[in-house]
Amino acid sequence: MRIAFAPVVAFTLLASAAVAGPMTPGERQRLIAHLEMTEAWLEDEVRNLSDAQLNFKMTPTSWSVEEVVMHLAIAEPQYWDQFKQSLAKPPQPDFKPQTTDVAMLWYGIDRTQRTTTGEARVPRDQFPDMKSSLASFKKLRAEMMKTAKESQEDLRGRQFLTASQDLYQWFLMISSHSHRHIMQIREVKAHKGFPKK
């Protein structure tokens, strides 16, 4: 499992400060690294799982691994559309975010605070199987990665919709949201009832 650069991402995010203008080399590197990390981790967690393992639920109302991946394939396009809506608006030089990059990262790590997703992001067989969900996730991630590598837009100077984050922080949040659900998959796989094969 590829985890080596997670501490580096965390450290450099802790050291960063929000500055208006195009992404700095450090900001770009951190964003790319986090996107790469979460995509690689997700693939690692679901690789070679059987149907029984993919469909196991810890409780009748909890999500299976397959449903978690489906949720990501449903949710990330919605979050990305919101990103693009905000990007289409002109920068706001006076906008100051009321949160930090670290808070965006911590959202993916801290599973003690549980939330309920919106109805439009609940997995309900929107994809025929896990492979289809994962393929859709990866296709959108390729678009995100291209933006992360090439964009010269001012993400710091743009507010995400009406929220307290700047647009760079929302980009981080999308990847951090995946991290959060990767942690959820690990919880499912660590459950005593999880099938051995």
Language model features by range: what are they?
Residues 1-5:
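Positively charged n-region of N-terminal signal peptides that target proteins for export
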Residues 6-16:
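Bacterial N-terminal signal peptides
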Residues 13-15, 21, 29-32, 36, ...:
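Domain-scale detector for complete catalytic domains at protein termini or as standalone homologs
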Residues 18-30, 81-139, 162-165, 191-197:
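Short, helix-capping/interhelical loops that line the mouth of catalytic, cofactor-
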Residues 55-104, 146, 150-197:
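Short, contiguous alpha-helical
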Residues 139-147:
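Amphipathic alpha-helical packing segments from all-alpha helical-bundle domains
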